[in-house]
Regions:
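N-terminal targeting leaders
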Residues: 2-7, 13-193
Length: 193
């Protein structure tokens, strides 16, 4: 049985499409292992932080107004939780912080929620690109280890988390401030002596 060139092409493209998922899964698993190995936090602390982010977001979204009108992300580093996103008013902003504080394991809350409409998917994509650029610049800069700083971008604002020296914090902020599209850099560091 011979296959027409069009059928051969369809088979090849289908195979590539299905294998692409395997490649992404394999690379993702490798990236996760590398992250655990290079992050200064222990693997247990990293898992605790991921769990805490999930618990805080769940607790906050139990509020109907937040769930319907807000967009909130929780970012945790050593139990210190940063709230970012958009809410309709200051009352909802305060409610979100109060709900987050009530979650077991939360040591500190940094409420950086902004009052206004939810950002667009296009802005979310721009923020992801900003985060990628900041991390890449840190890798080549050398003044601060990129693995020591967690970088999150939200609506053009870059948030830097981690446990670093004052010099490293300043270097990280300097690097982030020079990236196109960055409106503001917010340091949420715990400082070493």
């Amino acid at each position: 049985m011979t296959l027409s060139p069009l059928k051969k092409l369809a088979i090849v493209l289908s195979t590539i499409f299905f294998l692409q998922g395997c490649i992404v899964a394999a690379l993702g698993g490798g990236a996760a292992a590398a992250k655990v190995g290079t992050d200064p936090r222990t693997a247990g602390t990293q898992v605790d932080d991921e769990t805490l982010e999930f618990k805080v977001e769940n607790a906050v979204e139990k509020d109907a107004q937040i769930k319907n009108e807000g967009r909130i992300n929780a970012v945790s580093y050593n139990g210190r939780v940063l709230l970012i996103g958009q809410v309709p008013n200051s009352g909802v902003k305060d409610t979100a912080a109060d709900l987050a504080k009530g979650v077991e394991g939360v040591n500190d809350i940094y409420n950086e929620l902004t009052i206004g409409p939810k950002i667009s998917f296009a802005q979310i994509s721009k923020d992801s690109w900003i985060t990628t650029q900041v991390k890449s610049k840190m890798l080549v800069d050398g003044r601060v280890k990129a693995t020591d700083v967690k970088v999150i971008s939200e609506n053009g604002e870059v948030f830097l988390l981690g446990t670093v020296t004052y010099a490293q914090a300043d270097a990280a902020a300097d690097i982030a401030s020079k990236i196109s599209g960055v409106k503001k850099v917010i340091k949420v560091f715990k400082y070493l002596n």
